[in-house]
């Protein structure tokens, strides 16, 4: 393993379109054009192209998204990339903004009867200004779109570059950990030509609460063997979709097609979802300058190599680069450095840390015959986690002080402790309700008392046996719920403490569980019931987390 230094400016190329008017933006000498491109069923999709000056032809890079493409920031970023010798194309999904048709989510960009991404890719490849070599880029839903596109195997698709991506809308989007997220997706109506299309889509999702064939039709992880192009993937430690970014890299690297296996690269840094452009500013922390990543210069090198056959060495760089986070603002603190690896994850020994009486978190298993932590969960008065996305490195004490929340904390550390890998929770719980949620959070507690959040994840109790079927709780009966909390690479410094937090609500980030055990619909919360939930941490029911301690 080698420690490396990475620094430089960052720019999230297509992350958040500014609201400036479409006119009065000087893009010269790049030429901007608008096309309505027919799909295989005759519906026309809106495509904006940005062409470099000169005679061409040029390779093409394109992004699919549902957001407005006319913001000044988006157009300037597209023109900037075009200035490096590419035709840049921005594409709106079917039924959004200027694109015709009905918005049905990702159903028309995948491997079904309609394959809009595939059709756009091939149209771009056959234009007179195109060399026939096409690459893609995009963040978040633009990453989903790239995975969907790769499965359809367009003949002219050569490479991809994705940030904070996902593979399965069920697992990483609408039903994270089995919990529902309608409020987050209701807002997509603002992008639709017909806003009613989005409500109809959410109602359709309600008819499929479990992971069934409907959702498998939008799960790219089932089709890695069809993905057959090199891809550079950017993941973020403080991203609720980081699981998707990592799974995408691992799946393509080991189970992809012949041109995919061994040609993937991954970088994971201390960033928020879609906020790589903020550099080293994450939540309430300011990491050292080395936490920044020069995304656009690196992206240009990636596309220059694969689309222009430039031997610039980008294909020979480490398969994995990851940032080991450490204490911020403490001189000489370990961590806050980049490392490389040949694969993911690095070797680790899963080490148990047990919950105990008096809110302790210890390596020793409990010996008490009876030991519990009990709280009341009211879906109509949920605990508060502000926002609709993971808040990142923020002080969690306000959340931890709320009545429903239970914390388990180590003694101050006498030596630094590193966790690199995926944390797993194993909870023994009981409830007076037929269904409830458990949100597990991990924080780094600084000597001044700040509890800086690192990672969290929810789990709906009815899915403790798997997402393909429901298993409601028997009130009062102790049951085990085990799930992965998430990935991290963190050095907890001497004098710090490690804290695990458990709660059953955290809105609006996570939609409250009605706790009735009934159907999971948009309006189910109206019938919600109060539950008494208990975490057991005795000799026979040893609730714990498994921490990934590196094996050097």
Regions found by a protein language model. Give the residues of each.
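Primarily recognizes the serine-hydrolase "nucleophile elbow" in alpha/beta-hydrolase
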Residues: 63, 115, 122-191, 206-207, ...
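N-terminal cap/lid segment of alpha/beta-hydrolase-fold proteins
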Residues: 22-54, 409-415
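C-terminal, loop-rich substrate-recognition/catalytic regions characterized by aromatic stacking residues
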Residues: 281-552
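Catalytic cores of eukaryotic secretory-pathway lumenal/extracellular enzymes that build
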Residues: 90, 146, 159, 260-289
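Bacterial N-terminal signal peptides
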Residues: 1-16
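Cap/lid segment of the alpha/beta-hydrolase catalytic domain
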Residues: 52-125, 167-168, 173-175, 277-286, ...
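Alpha/beta-hydrolase-fold catalytic nucleophile elbow
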Residues: 137, 161-164, 234, 267-270, ...
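Serine-hydrolase catalytic core
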Residues: 207-266, 419, 491
């Amino acid at each position: 393993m080698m420690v490396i230094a990475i620094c430089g400016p960052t720019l999230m190329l297509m992350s958040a379109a500014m609201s400036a008017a479409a006119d009065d933006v000087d893009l010269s000498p790049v030429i901007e054009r608008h096309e309505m491109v027919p799909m295989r069923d005759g519906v026309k999709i809106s495509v904006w192209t940005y062409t470099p000056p000169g005679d061409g032809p040029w390779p093409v890079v394109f992004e699919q998204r549902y957001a407005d493409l006319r913001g000044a920031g988006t157009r300037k970023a597209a023109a900037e990339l075009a200035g490096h010798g590419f035709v840049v194309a921005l594409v709106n999904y079917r039924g959004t903004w200027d694109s015709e048709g009905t918005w049905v989510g990702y159903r028309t960009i995948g491997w079904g009867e309609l394959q809009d991404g595939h059709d756009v890719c091939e149209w771009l490849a056959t234009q007179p200004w195109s060399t026939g070599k096409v690459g893609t880029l995009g963040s978040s839903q633009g990453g989903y779109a790239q995975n969907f596109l790769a499965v359809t195997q367009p003949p002219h698709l050569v490479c991809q570059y994705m940030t904070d991506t996902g593979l399965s809308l069920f697992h990483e989007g609408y039903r994270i950990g089995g919990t529902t997220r309608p409020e987050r997706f209701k807002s997509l109506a603002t992008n639709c030509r017909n806003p009613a299309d989005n409500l109809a889509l959410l109602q359709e999702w309600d008819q499929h609460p479990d992971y069934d064939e409907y959702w498998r039709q939008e799960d790219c992880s089932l089709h890695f063997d069809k993905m057959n192009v090199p891809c550079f993937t950017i993941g973020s430690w403080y991203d609720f979709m980081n699981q998707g970014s990592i799974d995408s890299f691992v799946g393509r690297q080991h189970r992809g097609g012949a041109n995919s296996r061994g040609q993937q690269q991954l970088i994971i840094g201390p960033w928020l979802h879609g906020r790589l452009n903020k550099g080293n500013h994450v939540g309430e922390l300011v990491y050292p300058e080395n936490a920044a990543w020069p995304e656009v210069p690196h992206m240009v090198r990636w596309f220059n190599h694969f689309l222009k056959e430039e031997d610039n060495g980008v294909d020979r760089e480490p398969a994995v680069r990851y940032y080991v986070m450490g204490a911020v603002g403490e001189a000489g603190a370990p961590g806050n450095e980049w490392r490389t690896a040949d694969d993911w994850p690095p070797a680790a020994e899963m080490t148990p840390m047990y919950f105990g009486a008096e809110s302790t978190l210890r390596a020793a298993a409990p010996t008490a015959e009876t030991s519990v932590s009990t709280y009341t969960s009211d879906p109509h008065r949920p605990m508060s986690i502000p926002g609709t996305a993971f808040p990142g490195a923020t002080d969690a004490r306000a959340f931890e002080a709320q009545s429903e929340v239970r914390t388990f904390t180590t003694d101050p550390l006498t030596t630094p402790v590193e966790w690199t890998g995926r944390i797993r929770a194993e909870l023994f719980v009981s409830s007076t309700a037929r269904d409830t949620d458990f949100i597990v959070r991990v924080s780094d507690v600084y000597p001044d008392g700040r509890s800086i959040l690192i990672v969290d994840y929810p789990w709906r109790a009815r899915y403790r046996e798997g997402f393909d079927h429901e298993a409601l709780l028997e009130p009062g009966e102790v049951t085990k719920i085990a799930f992965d909390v998430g990935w991290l690479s963190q050095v907890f410094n001497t004098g710090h403490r490690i804290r695990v937090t458990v709660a059953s609500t955290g809105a609006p980030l996570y939609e409250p569980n009605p706790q009735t055990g009934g159907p999971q619909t948009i309006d189910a919360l109206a019938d919600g019931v109060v539950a008494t939930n208990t975490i057991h941490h005795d000799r026979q029911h040893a609730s714990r987390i498994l921490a990934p301690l590196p094996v050097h």
